[in-house]
From Swiss-Prot:
Disruption phenotype: Lethal; mutants die either during the embryonic stage or the first instar larval stage. Embryos frequently display head involution defects, some do not develop a cuticle and/or occasionally display dorsal closure defects. The nervous system of embryos also displays developmental defects. In presynaptic terminals, intracellular resting calcium levels and endocytosis is impaired, whereas exocytosis is normal. Boutons at the neuromuscular junctions exhibit a significant depletion in the number of synaptic vesicles. This is Calcium channel flower. SMART domains: Cg6151-P (SM01077). Transmembrane protein which mediates synaptic endocytosis, fitness-based cell culling, neuronal culling, morphogen gradient scaling, and calcium transport. Regulates synaptic endocytosis and hence couples exo- with endocytosis. Controls two major modes of synaptic vesicle (SV) endocytosis in the synaptic boutons of neuromuscular junctions (NMJs); Ca(2+) channel-independent Clathrin-mediated endocytosis (CME) in response to mild stimulation, and Ca(2+) channel-dependent activity-dependent bulk endocytosis (ADBE) in response to strong stimulation. GO terms for cellular component: cell projection; endosome; plasma membrane; presynaptic membrane; synaptic vesicle membrane. Residues 56-65, 128-194 are extracellular. The keyword Calcium applies. Detected in the imaginal wing disk (at protein level).
Length: 194
């Protein structure tokens, strides 16, 4: 068994089937899951740190810490439901979100990461919620899909739209009709030599 197969076996859920959508590379699929688990752990940890800011009477940092911890628990619930085996409905919730398109998860993670940063801008909220934001960005990139092949991009670039003439590819295609070339060999005939 190769190292990649061991890693994918550790990060795969029991009875998990491959998604029906466009195939993603294994390192992106499981790397995003691993990033989400790490992000959730640090969001909970730094959210707890922000909650302790009540000592300095900063209510906004207290609220930001609570929101960051909730976001960390939600991300952990969706990425690693095995951490919440004591709750019966966790697998159903994770499967429901798993069946949604990837851009749904990306939007959810990005939306959960922004309020703690706005409420209490500091290293703890920036790092904890920033990792969740990064996980959302990775899922957003996966939702966009991979780039088309070179042949497909060339074919799309050569298509004509609305009956226009095909694109000209010679060197003088962008020059205005009847334009005279510049000449630096002598003075222009209308120059007054002033």
């Amino acid at each position: 068994m190769s190292f990649a197969e061991k890693i994918t076996g550790l990060l795969a859920r029991p009875n998990q089937q491959d998604p029906i959508g466009p195939e993603q590379p294994w390192y992106l699929k499981y790397g995003s899951r691993l990033l989400g688990i790490v992000a959730a752990f640090f969001a909970i940890l730094f959210g707890l740190w922000n909650v302790f800011s009540i000592i300095t009477l900063s209510v906004s940092c207290l609220v930001a810490g609570i929101l960051q911890m909730v976001a960390g628990f939600v991300v952990m619930l969706l990425e690693a439901p095995c951490c919440f085996v004591c709750f019966g409905q966790v697998n159903e919730i994770a499967e429901k979100v798993e069946s949604k398109p990837l851009y749904f998860r990306a939007g959810l993670y990005i939306a959960m990461a922004i309020p703690p940063i706005i409420l209490c801008f500091g290293l703890a909220s920036l790092f904890g919620s920033g990792l969740i934001f990064g996980t959302g960005v990775v899922y957003g990139m996966m939702a966009l899909g991979k780039k088309a092949s070179a042949e497909d991009m060339r074919a799309a670039a050569q298509q004509t739209f609305g009956g226009n003439t095909p694109a000209q590819t010679n060197d003088r295609a962008g020059i205005v009709n009847n334009a005279q070339p510049f000449s630096f060999t002598g003075a222009v005939g209308t120059d007054s030599n002033v």
